Regions:
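An N-terminal-biased, well-structured beta-alpha scaffold segment characteristic
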Residues: 1-79, 192, 212-214, 218, ...
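Rossmann-like adenosine-cofactor binding region
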Residues: 43-45, 167-260, 275
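Oxidoreductase and adenylate-handling cofactor-binding alpha/beta cores
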Residues: 88-107, 153-160, 285-299, 334-338, ...
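Glycine-rich Rossmann-fold phosphate-binding loop(s) that bind the pyrophosphate
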Residues: 144-145
Length: 386
């Protein structure tokens, strides 16, 4: 039986995917085999020796020490796309709300309490909140992953002209994207075309300040920008300067900061993107399934620090080896399996940056002695026999 520790409140719908005959889910345990986490800060957490995996019920993993996990042979999973619909719906809602000045208009209405001539005041005051329909306008989508592709498709259905930029678009995302979305190979070519720009890329050193002085200079005057991905993707100083000059007429974001709160034309929401029970359920279910499949079968799906390896079992025992991505590893591993007289039914080896994963299905004397010999190979970090 595997022990699973939960560091946050995890949806019962997800926990139900962990069969109680194979998994013991507990909040208080010092030696878990797996951890389910949402937002708890694990950066300074000391990991027990038998910890095999951490599954994050969400996409971002900046609360998990990835490098240290890799060094200790701990597989880290996330749940890309599980909250995509929740975020996409909010983006479309804010796109419309921002275009029609809904937030500032609703706030103005709160001051009408007790006005004896409210109807006249409303008719007179509504002119200051004049907005625009989005039908026929142009939307630029930066990043066409699970969320960006949904936003693009929905905008097409609402009558917008949509351009998309994503040099790393996956095959699955491309298949799911409407044929009416126009693909741009260069971000600088897309920006001048757009009345609205929405960002849906992960936060990486290469994506920090995607919206900056240079990119803003290329945009249409009066462009509206939506950021429901990561706050750091937009350079705040450049944004505020562009709003003062009228280059940017509106900024809608899920990431409030002291610098932008209270500024005209800026609407902040308190990180509501994935805050729906449906999204929490979806994330928990995906995280639990990933964790279960790895612990029981050694399959790695949606890991952020290890290569993806997903194979049906071919019979016999399964040998799972996490090791450094170095030359000669396969020959060292197979030399030991040959010495042990094993017949390899199936073998997969994949790498991700400096990490690699080798998985073998074999028949014969797969025992503790073999595991110890495999673990003694200098570049091997962890060996499991399932």
């Amino acid at each position: 039986m595997y022990t699973i520790k939960t560091l946050n409140a995890i949806s019962p719908v997800g926990l139900a995917k962990l069969n109680n005959k194979q998994f013991d889910v507990a909040v208080d345990t010092d030696a878990p085999d797996g951890i389910l986490v949402r937002s708890a800060d694990m950066l300074n957490t000391a990991f027990n020796d038998n910890l095999l995996a951490i599954a994050r019920a969400g996409a971002g993993v900046n609360n998990i020490p990835l490098e240290r996990c890799s060094e200790q042979g701990i597989v880290v999973f996330n749940t890309p796309g599980a909250n995509a619909n929740a975020v996409a719906e909010l983006v479309i809602g804010m796109l419309i709300a921002g275009s029609r000045n809904v937030a500032v208009a609703a706030q103005w209405c709160q001051g009408l309490t007790g006005d004896p001539a409210m109807a006249k005041t409303v008719e007179k005051g509504k002119k200051q909140f004049l907005g625009y329909e989005i039908k026929g306008k142009t939307l630029g989508v930066i990043g066409l992953g699970a969320i960006g592709s949904r936003v693009a498709n929905c905008a097409i259905e609402l009558g917008m002209e949509v351009y998309g930029y994503d040099p790393y678009i996956s095959i699955d995302a491309a298949w799911n994207l409407s044929s009416q979305v126009r693909h741009c190979v260069n971000l600088n070519d897309m920006l001048p075309l757009c009345d609205y720009i929405t960002i849906h890329v992960p936060y990486l050193p290469t994506t920090k300040d995607t919206i900056n002085v240079q990119t803003l200079a290329l945009c249409k005057d009066g462009v509206k920008i939506l950021n429901y991905a990561r706050g750091e993707l937009v350079n705040t100083e450049a944004l505020l300067e562009a709003m003062e000059t009228g280059k940017v007429s509106g900024y809608m974001t899920d990431f409030p900061s002291e610098a932008i709160l209270g500024k005209p034309g800026i609407v902040c929401t308190p990180h509501l993107g994935a805050s729906t029970p449906e999204a929490e359920d979806n994330c928990a279910v995906m995280a639990a399934k990933e964790l279960s499949d790895y612990l029981k079968n050694g399959n790695i799906i949606h890991s952020v620090n290890m290569p993806e390896v997903n194979q049906p079992r071919a019979g016999g025992k399964r040998i799972c080896i996490i090791h450094k991505n170095e030359p000669g590893m396969i020959s060292q591993i197979t030399a030991l399996t040959t010495e042990a007289g094993l017949n390899i039914e199936n073998m997969v080896n994949k790498s991700k940056k400096n990490m690699a994963y080798t998985m073998l299905d074999a028949t014969g004397a797969v025992d503790k002695k073999l595991a110890e010999k495999l673990a003694a190979i200098p570049a091997v970090i962890r060996v499991r026999i399932l």
